[in-house]
Amino acid sequence: MVIPWQAGGETLTAVSVTPGEDKTVTLLFTNDVESAYDPIKAFWRDDMSMIGGIAQMTTLIRELRRKEPNVFLFDSGDIFTGALAKLTGGRLAFELMITMGYDAMAIGNHEFEYGHEVFAWQKNRVPFPVLGANFFYRDTDHPYAQAHAIIERNGIRIGVIGIMGQDAVSAIIPSFIAPLDVRKPADAVQKSVDELRDEVDLIVLLTHQGKTAPMQTDAESDPRLQRDIDADIALAGAVKGIDVLFAGHADAGTPEPVVNPDTGTLIMQTYGQATHLGYLQLTLDGKTRKITHYDGKLIPVDPSRWGPDKAVVGKLERYRSMYPEIMVTVGKTEAQMNRKYIEESDVGNLFADIFVEASGADIGFIHGGSLRKDIPAGNVRIVDILDTYPFVDDVIIKQMNGDQVRRALEQSLTFERGLLQLSGLELTYDLQRPQFKRIVSLTRGGKLVMADDQFTISAPGFLSEGGDLYSSFPESVAIGNIGKVSEVVIQYFRGHEVVKVPERGRQKDVTAEKNEQN
């Protein structure tokens, strides 16, 4: 029997499943798209010149839907960030997901960039479930989000659950989710599994947990930046009955499924930023509903192979035309400036220098994970700056002593959340030393920084509140606020005819030198 079904706004035909027959199911998935709408230069690859793009990914998804029966599409969170997401309060991201035909998503930490109330309003307007089984209003058992859902297509019923882990929670500005309690996931997941198991053919868990992803354009090619999926393996082992787990937050790409040795759960994740589409095809036994065969991979989104989907392009063009002010050029650079996650970087140095110049503070700091895009060579538009630092945050001036500064830098050198980018200091470190004892020397203008020295520092409010695990920042006293980070940077560009690439060398790793000497 042939029946019609809806997917991404177009009506397709698919063959229904006869009871007792083996079933083929294709699960497509994304994570950490983070409003990465356009293809980028694939300078780390030798098989394609460009990679990614939402419109190009949509074409790939539509092609797979035409070729394969019973296709489902999921996302594991972090759909918001960037200029257009900010200007629309996240509305554009959801509209694109509707056009692409998503069946369900989990909540990511970026969904709270505009506060819990804005996100609640947006998620309640979309036709697919936005899931967070461990989200509750503080001091109550009242859920903030739907825990799970059943998606049925052609007689195949999939139970989908969403959760967020504690590392992802710590990446949210605390005041933005103050009324919410994000609880440990295992109990919430098991509760949903128990409710779903007898009602569905397959259970899919969408997670947003593990270590924070490294914010670097070519992260997939740098072995130092590869994250593990231990948190997902552990959760899949702690909860009985999960067939498939699609993860997010760590951008820990899995070229093929990882199988939990105790439960058999298939675990996958992409590298994020819409550079790859996750693919997992399953064969289910028609009688037992057990997975008898699987084939999983990550498909690079090659723009030369998959052209842009017209509906997505039209939506992007319409929204961009609504905000012509962000396309205004505010300055130019002498060369492209790149981000690095665990190294001193051009973009990080520039922002820290800007904070010092604009505030008059002694020292400038910015967390490497906040820098979301490289700055192009030549003309720089407002949208480029908003996409580089997409958060609604102020530059805060604080009074800190030398001990607090040193502890912040030791925390940075664990690389748990990337390297803290700085201005006004000279730092030498040795990664072979134990954590929190890696600083070899810390000076300002050639003078050693002592524990009781007093400094004014300028940094984003996220750090000021202790975000990214920096406990010494909230200990210090706030003495000023010079405005939004993006506005401070825009004014700097407007005030300089050509913005030069800052000199490197303010943070020096002597580990390699020691190894050579030995």
Predicted stretch roles:
Residues 355, 401, 457:
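Hydrophobic, well-ordered secondary-structure elements that form the walls
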